UniProtKB/Swiss-Prot annotation:
Keywords: Ribonucleoprotein, Ribosomal protein, RNA-binding, rRNA-binding, tRNA-binding. This is Large ribosomal subunit protein uL5. Coiled coil: none annotated. PROSITE patterns: RIBOSOMAL_L5. SUPFAM superfamilies: RL5-like (SSF55282). GO terms for cellular component: ribonucleoprotein complex; ribosome. InterPro entries: Ribosomal_uL5 (IPR002132), Ribosomal_uL5_bac-type (IPR020930), Ribosomal_uL5_C (IPR031309), Ribosomal_uL5_CS (IPR020929), Ribosomal_uL5_dom_sf (IPR022803), Ribosomal_uL5_N (IPR031310). Belongs to the universal ribosomal protein uL5 family. Part of the 50S ribosomal subunit; part of the 5S rRNA/L5/L18/L25 subcomplex. Contacts the 5S rRNA and the P site tRNA. Forms a bridge to the 30S subunit in the 70S ribosome. GO terms for molecular function: rRNA binding; structural constituent of ribosome; tRNA binding. The gene is rplE. It comes from Leuconostoc citreum (strain KM20). It comes from the Bacteria. One of its GO terms (biological process) is translation. This is one of the proteins that bind and probably mediate the attachment of the 5S RNA into the large ribosomal subunit, where it forms part of the central protuberance. In the 70S ribosome it contacts protein S13 of the 30S subunit (bridge B1b), connecting the 2 subunits; this bridge is implicated in subunit movement. Contacts the P site tRNA; the 5S rRNA and some of its associated proteins might help stabilize positioning of ribosome-bound tRNAs.
Length: 180
C-alpha cells in the first residue's frame, strides 16, 4: 500500500517543482530525504528512569526503536560526565517517513494550542527544516494518563533541496501549514 503523501509528491508536487524551478530532469526536483526526531532529556542525569520513559514515548510516536544519545563533553555546571546518556533520537526514512509527515501535518499540528501555523524562518540555508514541539501530547499515540512529564522534541525534515526557497516550496506543496 503506497502512502497518500508519497503519491501526492510523485503526481502533483514533483511536476510543480520541475515547472517552477525549470529543472531539466525529475531527479533535480527536491524531495524529502529523512526525518529525525530528537528528544533531549537533561534530567536523565539525576534520574535514568526519565530517559526510559522518553525512549518509550518516542518509540510510540515514531513507530520504530530510538537510539540513546550520549554526552560528548563533561560539563561540571550540569553535573554531566562524558558518555552519560542524555537523550534519544530516531531517524525515519521511506514509507515510515511519509506516514509520520502525513500524521504530523494533518493530525498532530492542528492539536497544538493556539496554532496559527509553523514558522517559515526555521530553514538552515540548505533547504532543511527544523521544528520544535513543546509537548509530546499532541501526538495521538501518546496516552494523556500515562504521561508523567511533559517533554518537547525536535523534528528535522532533511531535504535534497539546494536552498531554502526550494525546501520551503517542497514543504508548502506537501501541505506544511506555514504561518502567513
Amino acid at each position: 500500500m503506497a502512502n497518500a503523501l508519497k503519491e501526492k509528491y510523485v503526481n502533483e508536487v514533483q511536476p510543480a517543482l520541475i515547472e517552477k524551478f525549470n529543472f531539466t530532469s525529475p531527479m533535480q526536483a527536491p524531495k524529502i530525504d529523512k526525518i529525525v526526531l530528537n528528544m533531549g532529556v537533561g534530567d536523565a542525569v539525576s534520574n535514568s528512569k526519565n530517559l526510559d520513559e522518553a525512549v518509550e514515548e518516542l518509540k510510540l510516536i515514531a513507530g520504530q526503536q530510538p537510539v540513546i544519545t550520549k554526552a560528548k563533553k563533561s560539563i561540571a555546571g550540569f553535573r554531566l560526565r562524558e558518555g552519560m546518556s542524555i537523550g534519544t533520537k530516531v531517524t525515519l526514512r521511506g514509507a515510515r517517513m511519509y506516514e509520520f509527515l502525513d500524521k504530523l501535518i494533518n493530525i498532530s499540528l492542528p492539536r497544538v494550542r493556539d496554532f496559527r501555523g509553523v514558522s517559515s524562518k526555521a530553514f538552515d540555508g540548505r533547504g532543511n527544516y527544523t521544528l520544535g514541539i513543546r509537548e509530546q501530547l499532541i501526538f495521538p499515540e501518546i496516552d494523556f494518563d500515562q504521561v508523567n512529564r511533559v517533554r518537547g522534541l525536535d523534528i528535522v525534515v532533511v531535504t535534497t533541496a539546494q536552498n531554502d526557497e526550494e525546501g520551503r516550496e517542497l514543504l508548502t506543496l506537501l501541505g506544511m501549514p506555514f504561518a502567513k
